[in-house]
Regions:
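A generic structural signal for alpha->beta connector loops
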Residues: 16-18, 40-42, 98, 126, ...
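Surface-exposed beta-strand edges and their flanking turn/coil or helix-capping segments
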Residues: 45, 60, 96, 116, ...
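The AdoMet/dcAdoMet-binding core of the Class I SAM-like
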Residues: 1-94, 110-111
Length: 182
């Protein structure tokens, strides 16, 4: 969860959705509540590591899982949990059949080193994927989905989402979306 900026954005976009968030650092949880406006009545926050949470979770499956697991030393971010085949499989098992998996990587090299490409094209649940990038950062977000989708479908969905369509019209959504390819 970090300081809760993604949780807050999701709460704005989807006001009637209950969000489950995991954060190991109690200071980040406090920041999310006090300074970033996370509505805790609509977000159930678990203070533990993502690995512990996923290993013990037996509740309802999720529509979307966002893996944004970073740590950093000397200002250099790196994944706190390796994006390996077993880790991706554990995340997949927590998704509903049509669920999406979004994974944040520090850069494209880190995405290439992960198990995402192998998992995407091994004939498993995910049939398509995208890499999302902003021109202002090196981060790459991989989106894995069970159905076949093209970038035109993604853009159409954005234009049909009221809050996002206004930002899209004003040129405020500066990003690139490309299909993940082997």
């Amino acid at each position: 969860m970090g300081a809760g900026t993604v949780v807050r954005q999701l709460q704005t976009l989807f006001p009637f959705v209950q969000i489950t968030a995991v954060e190991i650092d109690p200071v980040h949880i406090e920041l999310a509540e006090l300074h970033f406006g996370v509505d805790t009545s609509r977000a159930k926050i678990f203070q533990e590591s993502a690995e512990e949470f996923i290993a013990r979770y037996r509740g309802p499956k999720f529509d979307l899982i966002i893996d944004d697991l970073f740590s950093g030393a000397a200002g250099i971010p790196h994944r706190a949990v390796k994006c390996s085949g077993p880790w991706l499989l554990r995340l997949e098992q927590c998704l509903i059949p049509e669920g999406l998996l979004a994974i944040n990587f520090a850069d494209f090299a880190e995405l290439k080193e992960s198990a995402v490409f192998k998992r995407l094209w091994n004939g498993g649940r995910f049939k398509s994927g995208f890499e999302l990038r902003s021109p202002t950062t090196e981060n790459v977000i991989a989106i894995l989905m069970p159905g076949s989708m093209h970038s035109v479908d993604l853009r159409r969905h954005l234009s049909e989402t009221p809050v996002l369509s206004k930002a899209l019209e004003k040129g405020q959504l500066r990003y690139q979306a490309r299909r993940l390819r082997v």
